[in-house]
Amino acid sequence: MDTILRLSHITKSFPGVKALSDIDLEIARGEIHALLGENGAGKSTLMKILCGIHQPDAGTIEIDGAARHFADYHDAVAAGVGIVFQEFSLIPHLDAVDNLFLGRELRNRWGARDRKRMRAAAAAIFARLGVAIDLDAPIRTLSVAQQQFVEIGKALSLDARILILDEPTATLTPAEAEHLFAIMRELKRQGVAMIFISHHLDEIFVVCDRITVLRDGQYVATTEVARTDVEQLVRMMVGRRIESSFPPKPVLPADAPAVLEVDALQIERDGPVNRFALREGEILGFAGLVGSGRTETALAVIGATRAHRKELRVRGAAAKLADPADALRAGIGILPESRKTEGLVTSFSIRDNISLNNLGKYRSMRWLIDRRGEARTTHDVMRRVGVKAPSIHTEVATLSGGNQQKVVIARWLNHHTSVLIFDEPTRGIDVGAKAEIYGLMRELTARGYAIIMISSELPEIVGMCDRVAVFRQGRIEATLEGDEIDPDTVMTYATAGTRGATHEPA
């Protein structure tokens, strides 16, 4: 094997936690190598050591057979290591050219920025990737996939020979993900080694050559993709066999009351009018392609965005829900798609995040907060949803994705909501934590909560939902239930609409 990268006996501890213990990893030139493990397994810490962000307590890094010590990120970049983080590091108001050369602008002989040379170099990089990017458009106007390609281009502009891709498909459509895989294969052909981190195990079998699995900061195994399967990988990642991620679906009472009835919702003046109902104890799925109107519908219902026409009832009573505060008073909460930026204040503690929407509940005097009462409630809801953390004072930014999602759920339970909207609830969450979130959702419906679940993952729509409203171009094309909920039927309505359909929207 033509080894370009060798990590040997890497060990790293933080106060009270041994994050990595004696980890070995070898990557070949031109190899796409998957790094798998649950959140908290040590993947991020290992990659931060490779990037010079953390220094190991013990162990060595070799690139092309030469020992390396990275005092900081710039040392790693100089050695040919590049990383594309899950959360982009682009400047939104700058164009692709300026983002690629930010802080290292090319200069002409008079010392002025040489825009022409930088633009030509950027064009050559994107031609190497085989992607079309408007070089003069502000980054904020590009699609998420195009921004991803700019991040990859930035790494290549720094002559990266080892490229780390951290959850690169998390916000991409299937078609965009396929485009990314094509780019990865081209880079592989050019000899670039890639470390691919993903919670989507099916992607591993599409694009990777070998896999290394970590668990609880320890090395488990390295195997060729052709010699393993999903079940074996899951067992290596979680240390046990997961029979099924999805809890059994209950039989809903025929007379289960409707807790939310949308009699008419028209977002645009000339747009379709949608109608649907949500019953107590039910999980209603919103399925469809990206941009089909699922999230837009949910946001319009709670008043986060305006609608041309909106007629709805909450537990039988007409409600306006002019804004999210109205929705909250009516007992409706939302777990947004971007939990880190829209659902949490990550620099706050668990306690402060859970109390955020309900501080009045703990007011002991006009301006004072009953911290003891707040702590008791926080401990209670953390226990109910299964948040795993050292204390209620733990900063949310340090939690895994699954535990962060549970903190958002705990906040809404603390506010006595009865309707919860889960928008992409398992995005960026590992396989074990997904099963916990699914189980928690079913526990909530068993206690009388009603849930709208928006998801781009077809297996969880099929496995979790009692009924499914399928969206296409802003319209609910059909509402499926029971045996009608299968992948083929959902995709037929999502892509082809009601041509030849037998189901009516609910």
From Swiss-Prot:
InterPro entries: AAA+_ATPase, ABC_carbohydrate_import_ATPase, ABC_transporter-like_ATP-bd, ABC_transporter-like_CS, P-loop_NTPase. It holds the Pfam family ABC_tran. Keywords: ATP-binding, Cell inner membrane, Cell membrane, Membrane, Nucleotide-binding, Repeat, Sugar transport, Translocase, Transport. ATP binds at residues 37-44. The keyword Lipid metabolism does not apply. Residues 5-241, 254-498 form the ABC transporter domain. It is an enzyme of class 7 (translocase). It catalyses: D-ribose(out) + ATP + H2O = D-ribose(in) + ADP + phosphate + H(+). CDD domains: ABC_Carb_Monos_I, ABC_Carb_Monos_II. The complex is composed of an ATP-binding protein (RbsA), two transmembrane proteins (RbsC) and a solute-binding protein (RbsB). This is Ribose import ATP-binding protein RbsA 2. It comes from Burkholderia cenocepacia (strain HI2424). The gene is rbsA2.
